[in-house]
């Protein structure tokens, strides 16, 4: 592993691929609050964090599993769920007194149209200011119209594949073709439930 006497071992969290210390250092120097977005294989996690010398303080947070409390029956990590989770976290942050934050994407490499930007769009729409340029957030994808169109097409072409691919939606009692309407219902439920 070592390459001679001048080899410098990186910090443990950097070796594990968890922390970019240079980026974290810039956040600390800015003294700005951060909206930390992490995507796992199944879920979306959003936290609003303030810096403190003793350790970061989490002011508000939301997890995509919490969407089920508001009636969400879809997947917990698609673009629609990302938006709703960001919106929920933004409302909680506003209630806690945060008005603006910087996006902390961790080790994620920004790609146009990525799910992580749907989270930030949800945060912005909730009323928290986050600097974000044109990153390819599509309003049709935000509401799940692309999923509904694909489900409609697949049901006609290959019903077995349709039932297999959308089995979780169907088991939860949601027809994937009705996802845009379901999205609006859940969004209204979040707006009324988090006041």
UniProtKB/Swiss-Prot annotation:
Annotated function: This is one of the proteins that bind and probably mediate the attachment of the 5S RNA into the large ribosomal subunit, where it forms part of the central protuberance.
GO BP terms, alphabetized: ribosomal large subunit assembly; translation
Classification via Gene3D superfamilies: 3.30.420.100
Protein name in the entry: Large ribosomal subunit protein uL18
Family, per entry: Belongs to the universal ribosomal protein uL18 family.
Annotated SUPFAM superfamilies: Translational machinery components
Species whose genome carries this gene: Metallosphaera sedula (strain ATCC 51363 / DSM 5348 / JCM 9185 / NBRC 15509 / TH2)
GO MF annotation list: 5S rRNA binding; structural constituent of ribosome
GO cellular component: cytosolic large ribosomal subunit
Top-level taxon in the UniProt lineage: Archaea
Pfam families given in the database record: Ribosomal_L5e
């Amino acid at each position: 592993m070592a390459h001679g006497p001048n080899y410098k071992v990186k910090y443990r969290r950097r070796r594990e691929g968890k922390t970019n210390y240079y980026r974290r250092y810039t956040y600390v120097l800015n003294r700005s609050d951060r909206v930390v977005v992490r995507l796992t294989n199944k879920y979306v996690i959003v936290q609003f964090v303030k810096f403190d010398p003793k350790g970061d303080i989490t002011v508000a947070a939301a997890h995509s599993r919490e969407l089920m409390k508001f009636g969400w029956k879809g997947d917990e990590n698609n673009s629609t769920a990302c938006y709703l989770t960001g919106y929920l976290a933004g409302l909680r942050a506003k209630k806690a007194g945060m008005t603006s934050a910087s996006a902390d994407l961790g080790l994620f490499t920004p790609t146009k149209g990525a799910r992580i930007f749907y989270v930030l769009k949800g945060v912005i729409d909730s009323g928290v200011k986050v600097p974000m340029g044109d990153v390819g957030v599509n309003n049709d994808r935000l509401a799940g119209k692309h999923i509904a169109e694909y489900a409609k097409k697949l049901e006609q072409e290959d019903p077995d594949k349709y039932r297999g691919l959308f089995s979780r939606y169907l088991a939860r009692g949601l027809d994937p073709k009705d996802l845009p309407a379901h999205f609006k219902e859940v969004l209204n439920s979040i707006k009324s439930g988090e006041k």
